[in-house]
Amino acid sequence: MGLLKTTAQALLLSSTCLVLWPLAASAKAIPVELRQTEQGWQLLRGGKPYFIRGAGGDGSLELLAAAGANSVRTWGADDIDARLDAAHALGLSVTVGIWLGHERHGFDYSDEAQVRKQLEAARQTVLRYKDHPAVLLWGIGNEMEGFGEGDNPVIWKAVNDIAAMVKKLDPLHPTMTVTAELGGGRIDGVQKLCPAIDIHGINTYGGAPSVAERYRAGGATKPYVLTEFGPLGVWEIPKNDWGAPSEPTSTDKAAFYRRSYESGVIGAPGLALGSYVFNWGFKMEATPTWYGMFLADGARLGAVDVMTELWSGSPPTNLAPTVEPLVIEGESQLDPGDEVRVRAVITDPEGGAIHVRWVLRRESGEYATGGDFRPVPPEVEGAVLEGRANGARLRMPRDPGPYRLFLYAYDAAGRAATANVPLLVKGQVRTPMPFYVYQDGFEGMPWAPSGWMGSTDLLTLDGDHAGNPHEGKACIKMHFVGEVGTWVGVAWQHPANNWGDQEGGYDLTGATHLELWARGEFGVEKINIGVGLLGQDKAHPDSAKTTVEDIRLKKDWQRYRIRLKKLDLSSIKTGFVVTLSGRRPDATIYLDSIRFIRK
């Protein structure tokens, strides 16, 4: 899981800390040593025993240090200079992430050119940051093995090659790689295929209390760090009749944080070197409240109190409110416009006043995102008719589909508690429009630009180009250096690299057009655009295919549409296709706001 990014994108974890410590020219790396003693494995930093009390996320480093933590983790290393300086100024170390590509984002570990480029990027990261005094470990990859068996030897070779290079460049900081849990070939991959990896980083949620036992049973001997742990994962909780999971309350989650830390971290002396709790900040994943230890407005939840006590030995003087699971009066499956009542029980440990906010949102329906960015579903305005500390009354929307009612309970000190309950409006569900293929970046979009065709070695694709987007913060830049007579194409696929051998796709029934904005660098570039690519000869075809050919772009942004009426849009696995013809000296085009609409 974690804060993932696409292969071409970088993760910037910004700090809210305002006090920076410019790295002096005379600053030196603090040596970190991994030592095996009679009692087991031990980490030494600056010659002194060092147990990692850390967190991952983009929340305040000042609050993290004040809570008793001593370390922070990043998933990538782009533009982390300020974060390293801020961490060092606060006495925090940093496990610096070296992002490795994911196959589901289009990275191909059998492509030697991609692997070489990735290794060189890792080299530059190490050379840039190895002497910074905040650096603790190198985190080489995060769940790059994927969510299957995790036993692809080509991936493990790439990991080990990078780790071996890192050790030569920087003998002062140990190497770690991070896997999604321990199943399949993950233990053997790290233990047997990666001799240059010193530490096994483990992302585990429901399995955190038993991780030490399972790790030993799998034959592992290297030390481990819990690199992500938190509440039960969305995949670990049963779903209701329409496929929605019941999210634990913030109070129940806090209790599970404690259990995981006491069993999987401090309960495994000599094997566990510490941990990084997830997520120190706010994160939309499955729901807006599932994984974050803070709300979007900065309010601290009960998990912060628990970790403060576990790190520092003392709980905060003011604790977050507690909340019991919400209770629906009547049915949870309702007709459009029905009224429903929900009961709540909230307690403030100090006996103070509580104020509440009730919010109804459409359910995201995306529960297995692997940490990829997703936008927060909008609030359904006017749905909550009455909201109190002991319950709420609401009127369900007219649009059929799944929804979720959220309770946010605050005390006067900026602490909060959350609970929610899924609800369903009966009737035929239609995909909300507009439905974006691209909006301000590749990350978090339904389809991945993974289907490269033609002279792909001559193409560069940038989904975060900030120069003159049509709207928002970024647009797509395609730069092709092929000669006249050559061509290149990119298909947006779901899931990534789906050439018809996988299930997937989206039901876009009701969409009338695919709409996009495009321009050319010189106003002479020619493109073809389309929806759908996979024919009936494939095991899992697109339900429709259509193209618009020989579009000559202009230098200014122009809107283009593909008519979709009367097409079967029930299963679109290839959301968008663009091909670009070569020209002298090169061809550069820009695309923005690619979306399905209903007119």
Question: Predicted segments — roles?
Answer:
Residues 35-38, 44-197, 210, 220, ...:
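Active-site mouth of glycoside hydrolases
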Residues 37, 45-54, 65, 216-373, ...:
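Substrate-binding clefts and catalytic carboxylate motifs of secreted carbohydrate-active enzymes
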Residues 181-213, 234-241, 281-288:
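Substrate-binding cleft/loops of secretory-pathway carbohydrate-active enzymes
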Residues 341, 402-406, 513, 573-575:
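Short, conserved beta-strand segments of beta-strand-rich sandwich/propeller modules, principally
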Residues 395-401, 565-570:
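Short, surface-exposed loop/turn segments at beta-strand-coil junctions that are enriched for proline
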Residues 419-426:
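C-terminal edge beta-strand
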Residues 428-599:
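Beta-rich carbohydrate-recognition modules and glycan-binding surfaces
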